[in-house]
Amino acid sequence: MELNRTTRLVVAAVLLAAAFTGLLNQTLMVTAMPMMMHDFGISLSLAQWLTTGNVLVVGVVTPVSAMLYERFSTRALFLWSTGLFIAASVLGFVADNFWPVLAARLLQAVASGIIMSFAQIALLRITSPRRMGTVLGLYMMVVSAGPAIGPVMSGVMLEYLSWHALFGAGVLMMAVVFAAAVFTLPNIKAARKIAIDWPSFVLSFVGMGLFLAGISTVQEAPLVGVSMMVAGLLFVAWFARRQWSSAQPLLNLRLLKGATFRRMTVGVMLAFGVFLGTETIIPVLLESHAGRSGFATALVMLPGAVSNVIASPLTGRVFDARGLCTI
């Protein structure tokens, strides 16, 4: 579907706002962990699943979301996923114990995983090749700024409000996006029937879930933790073997045969791992061990968030002007 310039700008704004809200949500609970550990009487290893579980589900859902994009109309899929995010946020807002909160976080992650892939694919589809770097730079600004701003925003909010307000913020932000999409988002493409490899989805979810659960358990029960990690790796290996032999893989691992793609993938994984690890650990250390307030933690996290916001669009412009080698 051919869109005029004004429509493209409006659609891009809606997509970026949705992706930003989903990514902001990934680290929004980090600063709230000490408060929730106190309120629910739980350990750090259990509380961190509010963030780790969210990231895990996003990672597992993302490959499926590319197929969902092809199978359903863009408008229906976007409204469904943003609606799911709002419903999950409402569940977290009214919850009064840990397990409904965790369920809300995991449902938010399902919606976020779909929204993030949807936004990237749709942006590339409506963008001309000569503006690709700039648009991807804006998307990367959202990808990096969302998780970076999350702890800052939650730190400020928790200075005056309870952790319930974090879910309330998610409801309000995504409700605005949903309303804007109802009136402005066209069907960029028609739906078409394709098969989805659900067994591969289950293998990846079980494998990564067991591996991460093993890491969380190994300190308290070493034998159980190591066993879970080994079992998780076996499921992941089974998943990888299935992808190599499948004609329509859920995740096309054959791309890793390319040396450049392989190196860049490893680099992005390491960089994002360090980024998320730092975003998770620093608030817990400052609040639980150094006795700092949520607002003080927010101030510590602020410079990194600002740097991300500034650097990402500049990188996209440099890519358009000078190419990949300069970057």
Residues covered by each model-derived region:
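C-terminal membrane-cytosol helix-exit motif in multi-pass small-molecule transporters
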Residues: 171-190, 205-217, 231-246
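Cytoplasmic helix-loop-helix junction between adjacent transmembrane helices
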Residues: 106-141
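MFS-fold secondary transporters
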Residues: 88-93, 108, 124, 181
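Helix-loop junctions at membrane interfaces in 12-TM secondary transporters
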Residues: 94-105, 162
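Membrane-interface helix caps and helix-loop-helix hairpins in membrane proteins
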Residues: 98, 189-194, 215-222
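Short, Lys/Arg-rich, polar N-terminal cytosolic tail immediately upstream
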Residues: 1-5
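12-transmembrane solute porter fold
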Residues: 7-34, 40-66, 70, 75-78, ...
